[in-house]
Amino acid sequence: MPNASEHSFPFPILIGDIGGTNARFALLTDAYGEPKQLAPIRTGDFATIEEAMQKGILDKTSVQPRSAILAVAGPIKGDEIPLTNAGWVIRPKDMLAGLGLEDVLVINDFEAQALAIAAPADQDVVQIGGGAVRPFHSRVVLGPGTGLGVAGLVYAQHTWIPVPGEGGHVDIGPRTERDFRIWPFLEPIEGRMAGEQILCGRGIMNLYRAVCAANGEEAVLADQAAVTTSALSGADAAAVETVSLFATYLGRVAGDMALIFMARGGVFLAGGISQKILPALTKPEFRAAFEDKAPHSALMRTIPTFAVIHPMAALSGLAAFARTPRDFGVAMEGRRWRR
């Protein structure tokens, strides 16, 4: 755990959520003000993140940030951090040398999502089903997106500690008769079926094609957006079943994560897919699958589940951390660079 002297960053602080398609930034001028949202930057529009930050942010504001706290999708090892789903490579030493920064911290993207669920505002979440939050108990966040992100959040020594991992790659298997009809048509990864093969954007298409194949039908919808839109409107029966099954399987995995972390503080669904298919998630299938964990179904009924509807949840989490770093046990060794 970093000591207290390590838990401070000079203001102004630039916070950033660096995704595969878009990079979203905000400026925090002090510990008391709200972050100033900046226009999103498409990662494909700039060759490097340094160029994007210079031309897309610094050249357009009179505020010179002294620190940067960035959340990225990718392993954080060494002085060069390649993004999982984009061409950029994060080089913190180059940021210190070329952008006038004094302090750079890089964390996992789902650590930021976990930070955001420490104290979410009521208007930023929608409860799905029953259960009640137990304060200061463990929490879990799952986010179907480009992949399936998972992180825990545990409270110890008066500190919220995010626990990132690769929970999206746990095994997932068939349980019902319908599952067994669909499963042979799902595309595995290296011979096995991981949660991320179904519970993400491309996973929706994997599941849709398998549903169509099990029905002996042609898959006519071309992409994830078409499937979810057709499902919510009821225009395509295979799409409706796909999204219903997606909600069921997400409920199963979310329930597993709740048991692993004993997440009496709640299980939170983050990301754009969860927001888009919220009408499907509020139907009985998700919550029924979540609670169907014999011999612990009674326990599961007490654990609340939520959809995060804040449009910039990761930035909200980063801002909370930047304001009061001592409230969070974010590991910094090997992930922080200073001049």
Swiss-Prot record:
EC number(s) reported in the record: 2.7.1.2
Keyword list, A-Z: ATP-binding, Cytoplasm, Glycolysis, Kinase, Nucleotide-binding, Transferase
Origin superkingdom: Bacteria
Residues given in the record as ATP binding sites: G16, D17, I18, G19, G20, T21
Main location: cytoplasm
Cellular compartment(s): Cytoplasm
HAMAP family (alphabetical): Glucokinase (MF_00524)
Family per similarity comment: Belongs to the bacterial glucokinase family.
Protein's name in the database: Glucokinase
Lineage: Bacteria, Pseudomonadati, Pseudomonadota, Alphaproteobacteria, Hyphomicrobiales
Gene (name only): glk
